[in-house]
Amino acid sequence: MLVWLAEHLVKYYSGFNVFSYLTFRAIVSLLTALFISLWMGPRMIAHLQKLSFGQVVRNDGPESHFSKRGTPTMGGIMILTAIVISVLLWAYPSNPYVWCVLVVLVGYGVIGFVDDYRKVVRKDTKGLIARWKYFWMSVIALGVAFALYLVGKDTPATQLVVPFFKDVMPQLGLFYILLAYFVIVGTGNAVNLTDGLDGLAIMPTVFVAGGFALVAWATGNMNFASYLHIPYLRHAGELVIVCTAIVGAGLGFLWFNTYPAQVFMGDVGSLALGGALGIIAVLLRQEFLLVIMGGVFVVETLSVILQVGSFKLRGQRIFRMAPIHHHYELKGWPEPRVIVRFWIISLMLVLIGLATLKVR
């Protein structure tokens, strides 16, 4: 919005030309989202407390979590608000990639909101019925994937980028839709599963979004894309603004979500942020990179799959409790230790993922 306005005002004052620089807009996008999140935090927490929108804690969970019962949840609303406002202010409104991310972000946020509402108002720990949750998540993911396929069919936008191989980028055809679907829905659920401890999900999300900001900048730059042997996608550059907005909003939320948390993001935040990371990876053609950089989310999800599968097949559990962060809690690790160590692992994985762009 402001970019469009600046383009019309630059003829009156050349200083408005600064709005055309991607690096400038990336920085102010981050700061805008950060300040909005920090400003909304105390007000959102007070309002949620007034409405008695408190966290519902499972009785079969770790005993240390019982003290979290009643902590305001649905704080993801302030994350999404900060991201959307910042992106609308600083990104080019004509960029289709930006709108794809916003559709998934807001759409998954609405699904998460309904899920949270059922939990906090009806005191139902299960929330929205699983089949309906997956149905609407699938509708959004398939809708966006199909639209992207129609527009980008037989172009670099539908190629599969394989790490470590510079010339292996096959056309996916209709498999593009299937891959995009699983990445978007899978990442949404993976971040949701990870969001079980104070600040555990938001910091890896910030790290991954920051990594994708660098990838988006390189993908949208013809020279760097050629240098790194990745597809050049002319719309990808504006995803930098989206990624930095996620970073800013996430850091602002962490101010209130750090241990001991004053507010939880709820499904409205975790589903939306996971879906956003998924669609960003799809748009940048970096699904494999997401698996590496988002390794914490992958491990959390695999721990649940293995736990359920093992119990059904053998009648035995692999972990003391799943997702795996609860396993370490029950082993006696203090919650802050689990959180910070997972953060460190996440940062390492993002750096490793970025390094793979050059190792080809």
From Swiss-Prot:
Keywords: Cell cycle, Cell division, Cell inner membrane, Cell membrane, Cell shape, Cell wall biogenesis/degradation, Magnesium, Membrane, Metal-binding, Peptidoglycan synthesis, Transferase, Transmembrane, Transmembrane helix. It is found in: Cell inner membrane. One of its GO terms (biological process) is regulation of cell shape. The chain crosses the membrane at residues 26-46, 72-92, 94-114, 132-152, 168-188, 199-219, 236-256, 263-283, 288-308, 338-358. Its cofactor is Mg(2+). Residues 1-25, 93, 153-167, 220-235, 284-287, 359-360 are periplasmic. It comes from the Bacteria. Its EC number is 2.7.8.13. Pathway: Cell wall biogenesis; peptidoglycan biosynthesis. It catalyses: UDP-N-acetyl-alpha-D-muramoyl-L-alanyl-gamma-D-glutamyl-meso-2,6-diaminopimeloyl-D-alanyl-D-alanine + di-trans,octa-cis-undecaprenyl phosphate = di-trans,octa-cis-undecaprenyl diphospho-N-acetyl-alpha-D-muramoyl-L-alanyl-D-glutamyl-meso-2,6-diaminopimeloyl-D-alanyl-D-alanine + UMP. It is a multi-pass membrane protein. Its main location: membrane. CDD domains: GT_MraY. GO terms for cellular component: plasma membrane. One of its GO terms (molecular function) is metal ion binding. Residues 47-71, 115-131, 189-198, 257-262, 309-337 are cytoplasmic. PANTHER family: PHOSPHO-N-ACETYLMURAMOYL-PENTAPEPTIDE-TRANSFERASE, PHOSPHO-N-ACETYLMURAMOYL-PENTAPEPTIDE-TRANSFERASE HOMOLOG. NCBIfam families: mraY (TIGR00445). Catalyzes the initial step of the lipid cycle reactions in the biosynthesis of the cell wall peptidoglycan: transfers peptidoglycan precursor phospho-MurNAc-pentapeptide from UDP-MurNAc-pentapeptide onto the lipid carrier undecaprenyl phosphate, yielding undecaprenyl-pyrophosphoryl-MurNAc-pentapeptide, known as lipid I. Belongs to the glycosyltransferase 4 family. MraY subfamily. This is Phospho-N-acetylmuramoyl-pentapeptide-transferase. It comes from Escherichia coli O6:H1 (strain CFT073 / ATCC 700928 / UPEC). The lineage of its organism: Bacteria, Pseudomonadati, Pseudomonadota, Gammaproteobacteria, Enterobacterales.
